[in-house]
From Swiss-Prot:
GO MF term set: ATP binding; glutamate 5-kinase activity; RNA binding
Annotated ranges, domain PUA: 280-358
Functional pathway: Amino-acid biosynthesis; L-proline biosynthesis; L-glutamate 5-semialdehyde from L-glutamate: step 1/2
Cross-referenced PANTHER family: GLUTAMATE 5-KINASE, ISOPENTENYL PHOSPHATE KINASE
Gene transcribed to yield this protein: proB
Protein keywords: Amino-acid biosynthesis, ATP-binding, Cytoplasm, Kinase, Nucleotide-binding, Proline biosynthesis, Transferase
Name this polypeptide is given: Glutamate 5-kinase
InterPro entries: AceGlu_kinase-like_sf, Asp/Glu/Uridylate_kinase, G5K_ProB, Glu/AcGlu_kinase, Glu_5kinase, Glu_5kinase/COase_Synthase, Glutamate_5-kinase_CS, PUA
SUPFAM superfamilies: Carbamate kinase-like, PUA domain-like
Cited SMART domains: PUA
Amino acid sequence: MRSKVTGAQRWVVKIGSALLTADGKGLDRTAMGVWVEQMVALHEAGVELVLVSSGAVAAGMSRLGWTARPSAMHELQAAAAIGQMGLVQAWESSFAEHGRHTAQILLTHDDLSDRKRYLNARSTLRALVELKVIPVINENDTVVTDEIRFGDNDTLAALVANLVEADLLVILTDRDGMFDADPRNNPDAQLIYEARADDPALDAVAGGTGGALGRGGMQTKLRAARLAARSGAHTIIVGGRLDRVLDRLKAGERIGTLLSPERGMLAARKQWLAGHLQTRGTLVLDEGAVSALSQGNKSLLPVGVKQVQGGFRRGEMVVCVAPDGREIARGLANYSALEAQKIIGQPSDAIVGVLGYMAEPELVHRDNLILV
């Protein structure tokens, strides 16, 4: 299984706030230099690299002398603006010592939710990788709002892995990996070395929240691994403070937790759909529609929908659930919520008679639908 790591040619490496700022003491330039040295070695070995770096808010807090993470959005954004300057300068100077160029990219959820901007971001990242430049990516915390934020950089890293079609997502954290119990409370906790990303048993052991500086706990890392698996990427969750951690991963050493995809890689458009984390409404299906969608490659017709919840416009993402509330799929609606309310339960040839027009015979076309 570790051969999937040693043979990976395109890596996305995500480094969390606690690691980068020595648990809030300011940017740890020494640690950054050690990781850069290893990333340069990977680069020299032919590995293509994208770095997702947390730490802007934490670095800004340190510069401002704040000891507690603020809850007010404007204060968080001010800290991010201050910290991002130092963060990107630190990465740039450290990579430059080894003759490597870096590029700063700041993203919001809107950038990846809009198909055109998504494709532009993908083209830019691919161009940078081909130029052997190392992109340094962070969420654009200075302009993002709660409604359009990724929520944590683990999720952002997974979406970037999908964006660049990475073979491997490496999440460096302050834990050695995922354990079968909380090692802080249970001395008998055992490291989970390998598992399928979609194994439901992992949910029970991934509980808990992130530290005071960051937003992501082990649950967000598991969610990120599952998202990355949609594009066929393997994910390793591993301790960033382990000696020569990236070198050892490349050598195939059995450290950290390797989470592997169960299914094959999704088509490019469906990878984009998988990254649509924000939904605007819910469609409650009947059992016939649930059965049809579960077989795959089927569109959702109005006749199979029992109820419409929420307010959404045409082209926005909706959740499709079974009568018992289980999420079955997500997709882009061909009709607004108001229009959908009028045509659900009706055969497609009745749409014109109800609305006076027909945009599409399907409520959600199979090309715009992804099973979950």
